Swiss-Prot record:
Pyocins contain N-terminal receptor-binding domain, translocation domain and C-terminal DNase domain. It comes from Pseudomonas aeruginosa (strain ATCC 15692 / DSM 22644 / CIP 104116 / JCM 14847 / LMG 12228 / 1C / PRS 101 / PAO1). Keywords: Antibiotic, Antimicrobial, Bacteriocin, Endonuclease, Hydrolase, Metal-binding, Nuclease, Zinc. One of its GO terms (biological process) is cytolysis. GO terms for molecular function: endonuclease activity; metal ion binding; signaling receptor binding. InterPro entries: Colicin/pyocin_DNase_dom_sf (IPR037146), His-Me_finger_sf (IPR044925), HNH_nuc (IPR003615), Pyocin_killer (IPR003060), Pyosin/cloacin_T_dom (IPR016128), Pyosin/cloacin_T_dom_sf (IPR036302). This is Pyocin-S2. It comes from the Bacteria. It holds the Pfam family Pyocin_S. Purified pyocin S2 makes up a complex of the two (large and small) proteins. The large protein, but not the pyocin complex, shows in vitro DNase activity.
Length: 689
């Protein structure tokens, strides 16, 4: 082969990410060189040309190597970025975990480069792979040419190939060094971020613990700020203060729950562990703050309920209180209202009673019998009545008090002893009343022990230092009705009270009720055949140091007054008493109302008994009761309720007046009546109904 027939190989720079191929390759132009030409003895004729070709190819190879080394760091890190992108890692690591993921990419690439380097270095050992080969290659090549006297082509291609491998190994080593440094930098950065995260987490935890220890203080401070932002109340009542405080706390809870919802969203979308921990701590603090506010709200609600119950009980007490002055005069008073006005003045009423007593005494002296002498008429003012009220005197609950001695109370009777024994004192005269049309006539009636009982119960009044009043409590005869309270306002405190006290109790004067009027009438005796229905009456004794004489009180509750049933009730179907535990209760069935309407009853107890007897005898309604309840109902008792609807000792169905009797509701108006369980009855009254 002629020298001019030689074709030099080509240089190839291969960019393979961690592959096993050489980064710089020399590709020979031919794979066979044939039979080398004859070389005569003497110096080799190929040395000069061979060295020229070597230097030419070596220059190209060195330049390629130099170019790669110059941009090697950028290209290597670019490989890292491409691998990160393929792995779905963020372009810029912001957390220690992100950095460690990036470090894993770098370490994997470094391992791949090391394997490629090892593939080069593990080839059969020969002269060309010596560590100093690039420096010695030219001299070695020249020596080979001089010694072999062969054609230079084969030697040249082998030298260029091995130089390419040596340079590739150098590139791999440089890349490994770059990657190793990068890996260490990433490790240091990750550790730094972890340390910073630990420090930040410790700060967050310390802040959380401090805030948790001051939850109550923070909650109160926020409530104070919210309260200060509202218009200030001037001399607020406890009820106003409670209402304001309840509004503030309720709004604060609503605000905290909104924050709670937003914070829960932060937990789900937290960008890193620290932010998630912050949100988690905030969630715990919000739970504590809401619990603190709820505890406040519970206390406020409990106090509000307590005050409402006190007010309700006070209202019930007031509605059932007969208030009178203890001045020895004759007075009439309406329950929960005040003194009933007298048409011609209080003195005229006292005179009318005196006249009636005198007339009755004269009549009895000449012809002993049961006689009654009217002394006043009671009329109800229709202008003060609402449409739903029974506009008759029967709806007025009133009491009349007078000196008991005028009705024949012996002065020698020890009332205190009689009262302690729950005893009675016989009186020759008592008071009674009778509804006649739209008026009620009050009369003095003689007693005979048969038609009109002589015995009058005795009670002792006790001084209430809190109210400054003398009081007597008269228990109700029905479980659902409250007791009656009789009070007297003394002209001055009793003897054992210090009138010069710096804080004396000054009772309020008894108000005047304008809804009814007592008009004195001329004393006219009438004979009473049969048995007279008497209202409740008592003889009230007072402590010796009170200076108050014994008082006879005749008081009337519409429940104790005879009356005719009115109203139509309502049609019912299915489980009638199923509604007794709900809403306003179960209405009076229309078929029962039809049976009772128009009938006159001695008192409320009589009506109730006849009502339940009628229900027990109804062929349809009676099917809803068990034999035990039916047996009780046939005797006039109410049916039993299930245990969950009972209240203390109240275990039977009760009848409730939708419009209170004290407010003019009809006692026997069946449109005003509903059947309720004891539990529901209490709930209705607590609601102010």
């Amino acid at each position: 082969m002629a020298v001019n027939d030689y074709e030099p190989g080509s240089m190839v720079i291969t960019h393979v990410q961690g592959g096993g191929r050489d980064i710089i390759q020399y590709i020979p132009a031919r794979s066979s060189y044939g039979t080398p030409p004859f070389v005569p003895p003497g110096p080799s004729p190929y040395v000069g040309t061979g060295m020229q070709e070597y230097r030419k190819l070596r220059s190209t190879l060195d330049k390629s190597h130099s170019e790669l080394k110059k941009n090697l760091k950028n290209e290597t890190l670019k490989e890292v970025d491409e691998l990160k992108s393929e792995a779905g890692l963020p372009g810029k690591a912001v957390s220690a975990n992100d950095i460690r993921d990036e470090k894993s990419i770098v370490d994997a690439l470094m391992d791949a480069k090391a394997k490629s380097l090892k593939a080069i270095e593990d080839r059969p050992a020969n002269l060309y792979t010596a560590s100093d080969f690039p420096q010695k290659s030219e001299s070695m090549y020249q020596s080979q040419l001089l010694a072999s006297r062969k054609f230079y082509g084969e030697f040249l291609d082998r030298h260029m190939s091995e130089l390419a491998k040596a340079y590739s190994a150098d590139i791999y080593k440089a890349q490994i060094a770059i990657l190793k440094q990068t890996s260490q930098e990433l490790e240091n950065k990750a550790r730094s971020l972890e340390a910073e995260a630990q420090r930040a987490a410790a700060e967050v935890e310390a802040d959380y613990k401090a805030r948790k220890a001051n939850v109550e203080k923070k909650v109160q401070s926020e409530l104070d700020q919210a309260g200060n932002a509202l218009p200030q109340l001037t001399n607020p009542t406890p009820e106003q203060w409670l209402e304001r405080a309840t509004q503030l706390v309720t709004q604060a809870i609503a605000n905290k729950k909104k924050l709670q919802t937003a914070n829960n969203a932060l937990i789900a979308k937290a960008p890193n562990a620290l932010e998630k921990q912050k949100a988690t701590y905030n969630a715990d603090l919000l739970v504590d703050e809401i619990a603190s506010l709820q505890a406040r709200l519970d206390k406020l609600n409990a106090e509000t309920a307590r005050r409402k119950e006190i007010a309700r009980q006070a209202a019930i007490r007031a509605a059932n209180t007969y208030a009178m002055p203890a001045n020895g005069s004759v007075v009439a008073t309406a329950a929960g209202r005040g003194l009933i006005q007298v048409a011609q003045g209080a003195a005229s009423l006292a005179q009318a009673i005196s006249d009636a007593i005198a007339v009755l005494g004269r009549v009895l002296a000449s012809a002993p019998s049961v006689m009654a002498v009217g002394f006043a008429s009671l009329t109800y003012s229709s202008r003060t009545a609402e449409q739903w009220q029974d506009q008759t005197p029967d709806s007025v609950r009133y009491a009349l008090g007078m000196d008991a001695a005028k009705l024949g109370l012996p002065p020698s009777v020890n009332l205190n002893a009689v009262a302690k024994a729950s005893g009675t004192v016989d009186l020759p005269m008592r008071l009674t009343n009778e509804a006649r049309g739209n008026t009620t006539t009050l009369s003095v009636v003689s007693t005979d022990g048969v038609s009109v009982p002589k015995a009058v119960p005795v009670r002792m009044a006790a001084y209430n230092a809190t109210t400054g009043l003398y009081e007597v409590t008269v228990p109700s005869t029905t479980a659902e009705a409250p007791p009656l309270i009789l009070t007297w306002t003394p002209a001055s405190p009793p003897g054992n009270q210090n009138p010069s006290s710096t804080t004396p109790v000054v009772p309020k004067p008894v108000p005047v009720y304008e809804g009814a009027t007592l008009t004195p009438v001329k004393a006219t005796p009438e004979t009473y055949p049969g048995v007279i229905t008497l209202p409740e009456d008592l003889i009230i004794g007072f402590p010796a140091d009170s200076g108050i004489k014994p008082i006879y009180v005749m008081f009337r509750d519409p429940r104790d007054v005879p009356g005719a049933a009115t109203g139509k009730g309502q049609p019912v179907s299915g489980n009638w008493l199923g509604a007794a535990s709900q809403g306003e209760g179960a209405p009076i069935p229309s078929q029962i109302a039809d049976k009772l309407r128009g009938k006159t009853f001695k008192n409320w107890r009589d009506f109730r008994e006849q009502f339940w007897i009628a229900v027990a005898n109804d062929p349809e309604l009676s099917k809803q009761f068990n034999p035990g309840s039916l047996a009780v109902m046939r005797d006039g008792g109410a049916p039993y309720v299930r245990e969950s609807e009972q209240a203390g000792g109240r275990i039977k169905i009760e009848i409730h007046h939708k419009v209170r009797i004290a407010d003019g509701g009809g006692v026997y108006n069946m449109g005003n009546l509903v059947a309720v369980t004891p539990k529901r009855h209490i709930e209705i009254h607590k609601g102010g109904k």
